């Protein structure tokens, strides 16, 4: 979608390499991956999980991952390993839990502790591995990651002329 990690990544690649890849914004990944399989798209960028129909049918080949190697795709290099230099290619693109701002801090802390504790559960480990997801971080770790990466997102968005949607 507009201003998503995939959108910014495409624009950063265009900027660095003088390309003219046109981002096409879909309402979800399923129709995008379907478009790739049908041949109406030349390339697509999204999550490993949603790409499974493409990967399993051999109708698409992964050629890059964002900033961190993916165990399920050990031969696929990251964009920085392939020469991409934007700071944006160092962000993790994490998914986080959110609560209303008025939630008392002890409740936030307790829920964060429970989420981190769940990382040890064998069923949770299996789900994380299946969907190629990282274990949940604690509240302080998540906040530190957010504070570190937000300026990078904002710098990329500003330099690319993106406006909030």
Where are these regions (language model features)?
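Conserved, function-defining micro-sites of small-solute handling proteins
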Residues: 1-165
